[in-house]
């Protein structure tokens, strides 16, 4: 999309979650529903879909990583502080800095998290989701369309993943395998945080994210992934 990078970026923020969420709903109704939402078969089926999508992307766009320009990217020096003779003093050690776009991504993640929490706690859709997750048979007895709820949840989850991909592409690069590392970390976060526990998942995500970033910078990204995977077995 021509013009300012912000135009294409804003369009992707809207189109990508809707498109991916819609495809996820279709996949749920045509594939996952047929295997009766069995956990093991669902994992195998969705991983198979992932490989198909990766190969289609490879054949369409090729193996080259493509940089994406962020809509804004001003650099900001990160200050530190100490208590000196004149009280609290700020200084800028080690040349640490970040960008306005990375700060915006952090803010967007917080906003999405708050939105998901509000939806789960204060909307009818969230009530249906929690009821279905707590007791599927009881939800069916009360007339809740469980399969439709499953499809909606799968679509929302896929849409949020697409939103995260749009936000992260300007920081990294667009590549047909760009989802591999986030997929591994998401499994680890969910297992450590606890299935169905939003606070536990958030806490696990913060811990894993910070440790992964620090270890990747000072040691190696591979070591960071190994240590994160080992945490699952503890």
Residue ranges and their predicted role:
Residues 94-175, 198-203:
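Helix-loop-helix "hairpin" substructures at the membrane interface of multi-pass membrane proteins
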Residues 9-18, 151-230:
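Transmembrane alpha-helical segments in multi-pass inner-membrane proteins
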Residues 1-9, 85-96, 171:
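Periplasmic/extracellular loop-to-transmembrane helix junction in inner-membrane transport proteins
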Residues 16-23, 49-57, 108-117, 158-161, ...:
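Hydrophobic core segments of alpha-helical transmembrane domains in multi-pass membrane transport
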Residues 34-35, 42-122, 149, 214, ...:
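Transmembrane helix-bundle core of multi-pass membrane transporters
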Residues 2-49, 56, 203-208, 212:
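Alpha-helical transmembrane segments within multi-pass membrane transporters and channels
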Residues 2-6, 36-37, 97-98, 143, ...:
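Helix-boundary and loop/linker segments of multi-pass membrane transporters
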